[in-house]
């Protein structure tokens, strides 16, 4: 469906189209994977994150484009299941959104686990031939080829705002294609709200849930409260990576005075019980 003017929603099914009207409307269409030129996803040999959950067997060699959250989560799972995993990351910095002490520690652990993370590499093409995927990539001025049994494209996700709004809906989008909202998740149209992956902030399910609760409370006449700065971020790798609030780099960039401290994971109760010193 899509949003029309005056809080009307056009609902399209296989056999009919109807229009419904509401006093309030909440946009929660989620997100879709990014694609890159020269790499066509068939979800058999070249897959997105959903396709990477449907392999019939463990690939001997798995290539991953993108060493961000999705690439690391799925890449590390298939590594633990026995695949040789190579991750191509265009950025020169590993996990730049994460506190740098944490990202450095995580990079060391992933290397020990056998993940081959290649920073500063850009994939320009991927072709399927004889049940293999040939990947062409560059690192600086040098171009290389690599062959894999499967290739996962994990270069992030974007708001699913395409075809969501008609021209006269009145709802505005940002330059990134997200629905533009204020701190209360209200759009440019009164009584129309947007939450989750459609709007600014991390694309996390619990963030969308909190936004939905806050919007429902506001619609009901209560004080809906949501603070984007206190949303926990998490990357489901082993070891897990998680944080709440601003990172040290964020504080430095904002010119905010701060104190920092650290505590080794090996000295925590969980670390001692599991015999795990990483972190």
Where are these regions (language model features)?
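Glycine-rich dinucleotide-binding loop and its adjacent helix/turn
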Residues: 29-84, 88, 113-117, 167-184, ...
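Short glycine-/acidic-enriched loop or helix-start segments at secondary-structure transitions
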Residues: 36-38, 74, 128, 162-164, ...
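Conserved redox-cofactor binding core of oxidoreductases
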Residues: 2-26
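Core beta-strand elements of the Rossmann-like FAD/NAD(P) dinucleotide-binding domain
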Residues: 15-24, 141-150, 188
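FAD-site-proximal beta/loop scaffold in flavoenzymes
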Residues: 42-58, 147-219, 225-226
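A Rossmann-like FAD-binding core segment of flavoenzymes
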Residues: 2-10, 81-183, 246, 253-259, ...
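Mid-to-C-terminal Rossmann-like scaffold of FAD/NAD(P)H-dependent oxidoreductases
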Residues: 99-101, 112, 123-125, 160, ...
């Amino acid at each position: 469906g899509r949003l029309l003017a005056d809080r009307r929603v056009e609902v399209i099914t296989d056999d009919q189209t109807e229009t419904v009207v509401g006093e309030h409307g909440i946009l929660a269409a989620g997100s879709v994977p990014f694609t890159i030129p020269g790499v066509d996803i068939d979800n058999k040999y070249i897959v997105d994150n959903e396709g990477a959950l449907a392999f019939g067997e463990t690939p001997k060699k798995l290539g991953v484009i993108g060493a961000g959250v999705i690439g690391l989560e799925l890449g590390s799972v298939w590594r633990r299941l026995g695949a040789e995993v190579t991750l191509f990351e265009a950025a020169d910095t590993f996990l730049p959104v994460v506190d740098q002490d944490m990202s450095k520690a995580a990079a060391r652990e992933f290397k020990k686990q056998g993940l081959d993370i290649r920073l500063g590499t850009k994939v320009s093409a991927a072709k399927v031939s004889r049940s293999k995927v040939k990947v062409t990539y560059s690192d600086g001025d040098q171009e290389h080829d690599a062959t894999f049994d499967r290739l996962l494209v994990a270069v992030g996700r974007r708001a699913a705002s395409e075809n969501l709004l008609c021209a006269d809906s009145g709802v505005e989008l940002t330059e990134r294609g997200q629905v533009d909202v204020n701190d209360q998740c209200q759009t440019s149209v009164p009584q129309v709200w947007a939450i989750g992956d459609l709007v600014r902030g991390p694309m996390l399910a619990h963030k969308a849930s909190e936004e939905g609760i806050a919007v429902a409370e506001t619609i009901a006449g209560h004080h809906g409260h949501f603070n984007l700065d206190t949303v926990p971020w998490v990357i489901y790798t082993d070891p897990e990576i998680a944080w709440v609030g601003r990172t040290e780099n964020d504080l430095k960039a904002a010119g905010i005075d701060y104190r920092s401290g650290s505590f080794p994971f090996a000295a925590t109760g969980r670390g001692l019980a599991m015999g795990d010193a990483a972190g």
